[in-house]
UniProtKB/Swiss-Prot annotation:
GO molecular function: 3'-5' exonuclease activity; DNA-directed DNA polymerase activity
UniProt EC number: 2.7.7.7
Reactions accelerated catalytically: DNA(n) + a 2'-deoxyribonucleoside 5'-triphosphate = DNA(n+1) + diphosphate
GO-annotated cellular components: cytoplasm
Keywords for this protein: Cytoplasm, DNA replication, DNA-directed DNA polymerase, Nucleotidyltransferase, Transferase
Subcellular location field: Cytoplasm
Organism lineage: Bacteria, Pseudomonadati, Spirochaetota, Spirochaetia, Spirochaetales
Protein name: DNA polymerase III subunit alpha
Subunit structure: DNA polymerase III contains a core (composed of alpha, epsilon and theta chains) that associates with a tau subunit. This core dimerizes to form the PolIII' complex. PolIII' associates with the gamma complex (composed of gamma, delta, delta', psi and chi chains) and with the beta chain to form the complete DNA polymerase III complex.
Organism encoding this protein: Treponema pallidum (strain Nichols)
Family of the protein in this entry: Belongs to the DNA polymerase type-C family. DnaE subfamily.
Cytoplasm listed as a keyword: yes
Superkingdom of source: Bacteria
């Protein structure tokens, strides 16, 4: 056939969520391979993919036709009633002929979401009439109103409908659409449509309702439908396409569908020729910022603000400071971004004036002295040697991008201010699309195929938790690659791969806000989020600025909320702390750096992971620059240089510079290239690049395109020669820079976030109770994090008081150095009652009895459910009535209070016997024995995720102290090759079936000091599963696995409580299999951080406790150091290593000599004392 012989005008991509199965790239490339020169995109009810589609078509040399398959309400789009006759909506294809049509299409799609949402985003005839100009309309598929009426036998109504739409869109712009996918209904309605079209003189057009690119994709699309409708493929009543003909057919196949009506095919070409839309992409257009009338221009105004700000920031404004500010202002003015800076300055100023915490900076924006003077950021770029060119490159004009952190709880207030400032119609949020990544694809497809969940989980556990994971990368796992070959899973993997990266759902970008110069619908179609009701763009983050909108990132950072909470609690201490401000703290606080150097950084922003705690112990940071470097290094890639950094920091003699002239650039990081800015500075120093050129070079290096790299290397070497460097030497330096250009971190961002990290560390070191109370409040709704922070508080030596109706506030608070449990932290307790109980106490004083609480707090708030929860949590223990009695007689007490209130209200005391009522406080609860401690604690754990008033292990403290060889609060000090006995309570156990069909289990175990995940392997699980019951107190023997971020305990054997009481540790350890230390083995010293380990070998004849007395005396005399003590004990031709908890010694020569003086029963393993 001749070129441009047919065009597909009814096409759905995977932006028709969980319906269309093919990506835009696949559809366009398939059309191109078929020799088709144009293609339409008509996704269901949306324009999500329109601009992306245009870009893909341009890249492939295909003409893009922008359209949409609208949903049309049967009557008004505002009507939400159920229609017993007809449908909730009908389909209608509209295509944009020109820019007017495209703008009308945007309005239709936007209003469908904002005004017409009812199951689907709907328009109505009123809207179509208002916005029909520039549009071509097709009557659509079987779901269209015209085919529906004809199939119903309502020919007169069908004719009226066709006439109405022809009049509405115009004689040349309305087409009757005919399809044939092999469906009975289509064969029945096609002649009726043809007859009607011929009779009315309406042109016909043939389409295929494309839902996937190729016929072979029909199975994947069928599975996708099942995912969307939450059905299994085996369900006979599920929604499904009845044939596999809904693909992008060749022109020849489309011509064969209705061979007697060739004009149907020809009309597709004519329509395509009439549709000539290029979506406008003007780039970001700044909204107008109104300056005060006394200033002649925006430039005049910003220079005034910056000049004033410099004198606020600096005690002395030097020539260097003025020059840097003038340089930046000149660049900002030349690039025409003054308005952008003023907009950002305006809403940040408003936020600070309204006491909304704002972050000190984020990203490269922290490198600007103009931003610092305007108080957009709080990072001095001169002090930290930050480069403005990393933020705004004068040689590469692009929109600056301030990412701004606000208090998590008050971020929305700033957004509302911006909305009020620039107009509600001009401000919106940004849509994002969730896609089927490998793990999600396996889970969803596995469910649809009826594969047991245990098997699906077994497969997904073989995939790393990486948001950028692809199937290709996942198959690098040998186990997963083998599993893919198993016939049982062949279809699962085949379909999951085909659906990889398919759009699955929409949501709102966590931070993105857009501002338009005029209404957003002048630039992009809009979407209304069904969960929040918030308005967003239909185009994603990467496309909106092309369309003319300005993007801002308003991030909600919980850490700012944490700092604010802590600051408020500190101020409540009174006295000198009344005016305490985090902005006034010293950045050289020795207490803070001492804590960090010990690795005690749990709950410290950016430094709380176990891995980072270990790095801190080794690196011993002593200044802010150290924190910045560690923050930048502790990431995939640069992490490989941490050892070099630490060694060079410890021993300056090991520092090596690529060239001596680079010392001033690299000295702060001890010769290691850590930051992107250092790459730029090296290029400037060696090759004479301007910083703008150096930034372009850095970006090119990061992309690692071979041809570009070779060209840049040549340029670098040639320019270095002109600077007086040897060419070969310059090429070597270029090669050194390459990995760092990719790995190197943005110093501005590392600096800003390290400042926030330091602030949290300062608060933890100096105000531990307030800091941990604030952390607990921050995570008050997190069942996972709340217990972790409570455990950390306990590890820090802080006391946590149980909830108390006369002491607790809604959030966690501090009283006399103790943390008081917050009412909102009690699981299931309503928010309203927490505030009502507190507010009433503040207004009218403490409560004197439980009944008085019921009397004073509204019953609508403190209902039976909430009262029972508070009883069980211990809120009323202070009144001397057992929780058992309060619970058992709660109904009676509530009835009593209700009667009392009725009497007081009606003033008809005579209706009741006064002796029955009296005063509320006189109500007496019958005496009842309290619940057992175990039951009381079980309920506390259930309600608060933690044991508050005690611990189930309290009565076993002596046994644990005597028998346990590992304290879970210090599990990081364990050694993976050693066997340990832990004693505690089993919190949870989860059976699991391996791929080979064997049963094992995972669980959670807790002792008095911490908790750990445990792994019980098949043999042990089969033999002892009856012993692994939740809340059982037991001993476990095994090893610690450090292969993951969080350590796990691999269980070798289980010891019940009675065995534990009477067995000796050596017997318990000897009874376990797979011993790590066998007879005669010596365990060498292994350093953990900078701490030392002292291994002492005990002679085989030493047995009784008394025989260790002299050894204990020596150890006690040398405590206070960093050497952790391990005893190597010989029993029955085996060697056991026992860790001595809470004993750290100074391994001096005196210590060694004293031990050697007792050679009759002890010797030091020589390699262990240094």
């Amino acid at each position: 056939m001749a070129r441009m012989s047919f065009v597909h005008l009814h096409v759905h991509s995977n932006y028709s969520l969980l319906d269309g199965a093919s990506s835009l790239q696949r559809l366009v490339r398939t059309a191109k391979s078929l020799g088709q020169e144009a293609l339409a995109l008509t996704d269901h009810g949306n324009m999500f993919g329109a601009l992306h589609f245009q870009k893909v078509c341009s890249a492939e040399g295909i003409k893009a036709i922008i359209g949409c398959e609208l949903y049309v309400a049967p009557e008004s789009r505002f009507d939400r009633s159920e229609h017993t006759i007809g449908r909730r909506y009908y389909h209608l294809i509209v295509l944009a002929k020109n820019e007017t049509g495209y703008r009308n299409l945007m309005v239709l799609s936007s209003k469908a979401y904002i005004e017409g949402m009812y199951y689907k985003p709907r328009v109505d005839d009123e809207l179509l009439a208002q916005h029909a100009e520039g549009l071509i309309c097709l009557s659509s598929c079987l779901a269209g109103q015209l085919p529906y009426l004809l199939l119903q036998g309502r020919k007169r109504e069908a004719e009226e409908h066709a006439r109405k739409y022809r009049a509405l869109f115009g004689v040349d712009n309305y087409f009757i659409e005919v399809q044939d996918h092999g469906l009975d209904e289509e064969k029945k309605v096609a002649p009726l449509l043809i007859e009607l079209a011929c009779r009315l003189g309406i042109p016909l057009v043939v389409t295929n309702d494309v839902h996937y690119a190729e016929q072979e994709d029909s199975v994947a699309q069928d599975i996708l439908l099942c995912i969307g409708t939450k059905k299994n493929r085996s369900d006979p009543n599920r929604l499904k396409f009845k044939t596999d003909e809904f693909y992008l057919k060749s022109s020849e196949k489309m011509a064969q569908l209705f061979p007697h009506y060739p004009e149907m095919v020809l009309n597709t070409v004519r329509i395509a020729q009439r549709c000539n839309v290029r979506i406008p992409q003007p780039g970001p257009l700044l909204p107008l910022y109104q300056i005060p009338h006394e200033f002649s221009s925006k430039e005049h105004y910003i220079r005034h603000l910056v000049h004033r700000g410099l004198y606020d920031r600096y005690a002395v404004v030097s020539e260097e400071i003025k020059a840097r500010a003038d340089y930046e202002l000149d660049v900002i003015v030349r690039m025409d971004f003054v308005g952008y800076f003023l907009i950002v300055w305006d809403f940040i100023t408003w936020a600070k004036e309204h006491d909304i915490p704002v972050g000190p900076g984020r990203g490269s924006g922290a490198s600007s002295i103009v931003a610092y003077a305007l108080k957009i950021t709080d990072i001095d770029p001169l002090r930290y040697k930050l480069l403005f060119e990393r933020f705004m490159n004068p040689e590469r004009i692009s929109m600056p991008d301030f990412d701004i952190d606000f208090c998590f709880e008050r971020r929305q207030e700033v957004i509302e201010y911006v909305r009020a400032r620039y107009g509600n119609d001009n401000v919106g949020q940004i849509i994002t699309f969730g896609t089927l990544k490998p793990k999600a694809a396996i889970r969803d497809v596995g469910r649809v195929l009826d594969i047991p969940l245990s098997e699906v989980l077994m497969i997904t556990k073989l995939m790393p938790d990486d948001p950028k994971l692809t199937f290709k990368k996942a198959y690098e796992s040998e186990q997963l690659a083998q599993m893919k070959q198993e016939p049982r899973y062949a279809e699962l993997f085949q379909i999951a791969e085909k659906l990889e990266d398919t759009n699955r759902n929409t949501s709102l970008h966590a931070a993105g806000i857009v501002i338009g110069k005029t209404a957003l619908t002048d630039y992009v179609p809009l979407y209304k989020d069904s969960k929040t009701g918030k308005i967003s763009t239909q185009f994603g983050m990467d496309l909106i600025e092309d369309c003319g909108l300005v993007k801002m990132d308003f991030l909600g950072l919980k850490t700012l909320t944490l700092i604010q909470r802590t600051q408020n609690l500190v101020r409540r201490k009174g006295g000198k702390y009344t005016t305490f401000s985090i902005s006034d703290i010293s950045d050289q606080d020795p207490t803070t750096f001492s804590m960090l150097a010990e690795g005690k950084s749990a709950a410290v922003f950016q430094f709380e992971s176990r891995g980072m705690q270990g790095i801190l112990k080794r690196a011993k940071p002593s200044k802010m620059e150290d924190l910045i470097a560690l923050n930048a290094l502790y990431r995939p890639g640069p992490m490989a240089f941490i050892d070099q950094y630490i060694e060079s920091k410890r021993d300056p003699g090991k520092i090596k510079y690529p060239d001596p002239c680079l010392e001033d650039i690299l000295s702060e990081t001890y010769g290691v290239i850590v930051y992107q800015e250092q790459v730029m500075q090296v290029a400037q120093r060696i090759a004479g690049f301007s910083l703008g050129e150096a930034d372009i070079l850095r970006r090119a290096m990061g992309k690692k395109k071979l041809a570009v790299m070779q060209e840049k290397k040549k340029e670098f070497a040639e320019r270095a020669e002109k600077q007086g460097f040897d060419k070969k030497h310059a090429e070597n330096i270029f090669e050194i820079l390459i990995p760092f250009a990719g790995y190197g971190f943005n110093k501005s961002h590392a600096t800003a976030y390290s400042v926030v990290a330091y602030q949290t560390a300062f608060l933890k070191a100096n105000f531990p109770a307030e800091f941990m109370a604030a952390n607990l409040s921050n995570e008050i709704n997190s069942a996972e994090k709340l217990p972790l922070y409570m455990a950390e508080a306990e590890k820090m030596g802080l006391s946590i008081q149980k909830p108390d109706v006369n002491a607790s506030e809604p959030y966690f608070s501090v009283c006399e150095g103790c943390i008081v449990y917050g009412l909102l932290g009690i699981k299931g307790l309503g928010e309203q009652v927490a505030f009502d109980v507190f507010d009433e106490r503040i207004r009218n004083g403490p409560y004197t009895s439980f009944v008085e609480v019921l009397d004073r707090v509204p019953a609508t708030s403190l209902n039976k459910k909430n009262a029972e929860i508070m009883i069980k949590a211990g809120c009323f223990d202070r009144f001397g009535v057992t929780r058992a009695s309060l619970t058992a007689h709660l109904d009676d007490a509530m009835k009593y209070v209700a009667r009392k209130k009725a009497v007081t209200s009606s003033r008809q005391a005579s209706l009741f016997d006064e002796t029955d009522l009296g005063e509320c406080s006189e109500y007496t609860f019958p005496v009842m024995e309290e619940w057992s401690q175990r039951e009381r604690l079980r309920i506390e754990k259930e309600l608060m995720g933690y044991y508050i008033s005690g611990h189930p292990l309290d009565e076993y403290r002596s046994v644990i102290g005597e028998k346990a060889t590992l304290d879970l609060g210090h599990i990081e000090n364990a050694r993976s090759e050693n066997k340990y006995l832990i004693v505690g309570v089993l919190n949870a156990i989860h059976p699991y079936t391996t791929k080979s069909g064997k049963n094992m289990a995972f669980g959670s175990f807790e002792d008095l000091h911490g908790s750990v995940d445990i792994v019980v392997f098949p043999v042990l699980w089969e033999e002892h599963r009856a012993q692994f019951l939740p809340e059982t107190i037991m001993g476990l023997v095994g090893t610690v696995d450090f292969s993951k971020e969080t350590p796990a305990f691999l269980v070798d054997s289980v010891i019940d409580l009675e065995q534990l009481r009477f067995a000796q540790v050596k017997t318990i350890l000897a009874g376990s299999e797979h011993r790590r230390v066998s007879s005669g083995e010596k365990t060498p010293l292994q350093k953990r951080g900078v701490s030392q380990e002292v291994h002492i070998e005990v002679s085989s004849h030493v047995r009784a406790h008394a025989q260790f007395k002299s050894l204990y005396e020596i150890l006690s005399a040398h405590t206070g150091g960093s050497g952790e003590v391990f005893l190597h004990m010989h029993v029955d031709d085996r060697t056991y290593v026992v860790y001595v908890p809470s004993c750290k010694v100074s391994a001096t020569e005196v210590f060694a000599q004293q031990l050697k003086g007792n050679e009759s029963f002890v010797q030091i393993l020589k390699e262990c004392v240094q």
